[in-house]
Amino acid sequence: MYLKGLYTALITPFTPTGQLDEEGLKKLIQIQLHHQVDGVVVLGTTGESPTLTQIEKRRIIEIALEEIQGRIKVIVGTGSYSTQQAIEQTLQAKQMGADAALIVTPYYNKPTQEGIFKHFEAINQAVSFPICLYNIQGRTGQNIQTHTLKRISTLSSIIGVKETSGDINQIMDVIEAFRQSHPNFAILSGDDALTLPMIALGGHGIISVVSNLVPAAMKSLVNAALNGNFKKARIIHNQLYSFIKAAFIETNPIPIKAALSLSKLPAGSCRLPLCDLSQNHSQKLAQILNELPQEWISHG
């Protein structure tokens, strides 16, 4: 399996009473299908996976698979600070018919580099299923160093990495480490602002937050960059940049859910301990949305 292009990290919409909004989720998925993204990620950071019950997680996977019907890839976040739990969640994703798992570095318990390797080695041994690593030190407290990433990549199920270090030196090290020896190892940006720079340096695409609202624009940017049309990609990037910054003005997914709500799309509030966007930031976000080309914005 080869990952390339635009993958939307879907939010999880909630009703006013805080329940999973199943119809809202279906609508959001249909928007992504309409704009022909390459895949969606459910149960990731943007999907508020830490606050979802196991029943809700299973239902979200079911809805995604039912709506998509194999037309694009469905990637499921199955990571945990518990190796056994990560194995169980990855096995569930496989059995339900997903295409791949996105597995974050174990968080909170801060394993060593050897522990990180053994974590993924154990998952690889337990479940034969495509796995994309998720490196995001700002949330996990631990960085997958490039030499460790190289070791993990030799495991049979590992197909790529969502690189969200934000460190351009590390990003370059990762790209160079695989450019010759493993060119099909997918190196995906986890930071919308670095989509264009990463592809220009040799990356393969993006797992995007902002494409929840502007999938058409992000699809055009990614396609242009992957096809070497950096002039076009740069124009789109520059037009989107204010919104990209605003989408992270508070902790993700608070701002993107606010942006969806402002556009009359299903979102709802985040679950505690995440709370609603501040009034000041909401006003700023609304102004930025008004300044975007309106044909880019999905509306309810």
Swiss-Prot record:
What SUPFAM superfamilies does UniProt report for this protein, alphabetically? Aldolase
Keyword Amino-acid biosynthesis assigned to the entry: answer is yes
Q: Which GO terms describe its molecular function?
A: 4-hydroxy-tetrahydrodipicolinate synthase activity
Location in the cell reads: Cytoplasm
Q: Name one GO cellular component term.
A: cytosol
Primary role: Catalyzes the condensation of (S)-aspartate-beta-semialdehyde [(S)-ASA] and pyruvate to 4-hydroxy-tetrahydrodipicolinate (HTPA).
| Family membership noted in the UniProt record | Belongs to the DapA family.
Q: Which NCBIfam families match?
A: dapA
Query: Any idea what this protein is called?
Result: 4-hydroxy-tetrahydrodipicolinate synthase
Q: Which organism is it from?
A: Protochlamydia amoebophila (strain UWE25)
